[in-house]
Amino acid sequence: MSQLDALREMTVVVADTGDIEAIKQYQPQDATTNPSLILNASALPQYASLIDDAVAYAKAKSDDKAQQLIDAEDKLAVNIGLEILKIVPGRISTEVDARLSYDTEATIEKARQIMKLYNDAGISNDRILIKIASTWQGIRAAEVLEKEGINCNLTLLFSQAQARACAEAGVYLISPFVGRILDWYKAAEKKEYAPAEDPGVISVTNIYNYYKQYGYQTVVMGASFRNVGEITEIAGCDRLTIAPPLLKELAESNAPLVRKLEYKGEVKARPAPLTEAEFYWQHNQDPMAVEKLAEGIRKFAVDIEKLEAMLAAKL
């Protein structure tokens, strides 16, 4: 049995890509996209018609150039999502514009708009996750959306404070990052880490155990992997979203896979929810998390602007 098949027996495997061919090849349960992946996917020749459709939709909806750009961007992300939903049996994660990461109301509105585009295409809410950065404002937006029946995937999650606040808000799923945490520690400490000592692996392990210990239903989906060792060290996590090159490596390996994450303790009474002040104080105590959250939002915003430049040339 390949490591990928062994992993499927203990963890829901998700593909972290917008590439339809890769998804067909590895048959994941779900798929996740982000602005960077949408940008990469839109350069593939098979997506030209999806871009043309998004542009035509935006032109028909508004005469205002700025509004056309916003509409085309949303429609392109949804068009790619719709193609992926033809292949995966589960859910697609589609991300809210990262530039709205500190605006609760604008995030809620954008999430509703994305969901309406999916609904108009005949897709029900239970096949979509709206991806939102795990800022305090993003978590508050998700809290409102969850009550409306719009499930969220809180991403760019690097600190225990972020994870705790998401669970307390009743968020459907979180994406704690592994590889980007490792990147930070390698740069800061000038050293290499074995998978079992990988700070990203330790972070996800702690979050997983915290959630199970307090009986939170929020799904933990490890994300952002730099190597297969990081994946095998958190085998047993609720879900793992994995890029095609690492899915390939897992599919080609027959090395034994041992379940690493499994909580067997009793469920304890939950602490009082974090206040906004406590959230910021605790998150701020982790310089890695502060830097990586800010950097992640900036990088996604840069890729959204590149995507907009590509679309603007067609509008």
UniProtKB/Swiss-Prot annotation:
Family: Belongs to the transaldolase family. Type 1 subfamily.
Protein name (database record): Transaldolase
Keywords: Cytoplasm, Pentose shunt, Schiff base, Transferase
One term under GO cellular component: cytosol
Domain of life: Bacteria
List of catalytic residues: 131 (schiff-base intermediate with substrate)
Organism annotation: Actinobacillus pleuropneumoniae serotype 3 (strain JL03)
Top EC class of this enzyme: transferase
Pathway(s) this gene product operates in, as recorded in its UniProt entry: Carbohydrate degradation; pentose phosphate pathway; D-glyceraldehyde 3-phosphate and beta-D-fructose 6-phosphate from D-ribose 5-phosphate and D-xylulose 5-phosphate (non-oxidative stage): step 2/3
InterPro entries on file: Aldolase_TIM (IPR013785), TAL/FSA (IPR001585), Transaldolase_1 (IPR004730), Transaldolase_AS (IPR018225)
UniProt function note: Transaldolase is important for the balance of metabolites in the pentose-phosphate pathway.
GO molecular function, one term: transaldolase activity
Annotated GO biological process: carbohydrate metabolic process; pentose-phosphate shunt
Coiled-coil positions: none
EC number: 2.2.1.2
Pfam families with a match to the protein in the record: TAL_FSA
Primary location recorded for the protein, binned into one broad class: cytoplasm
PROSITE patterns linked to this entry: TRANSALDOLASE_1 (PS01054), TRANSALDOLASE_2 (PS00958)
Compartments in which it is found: Cytoplasm
Complex formation: Homodimer.
Reactions listed under catalytic activity: D-sedoheptulose 7-phosphate + D-glyceraldehyde 3-phosphate = D-erythrose 4-phosphate + beta-D-fructose 6-phosphate
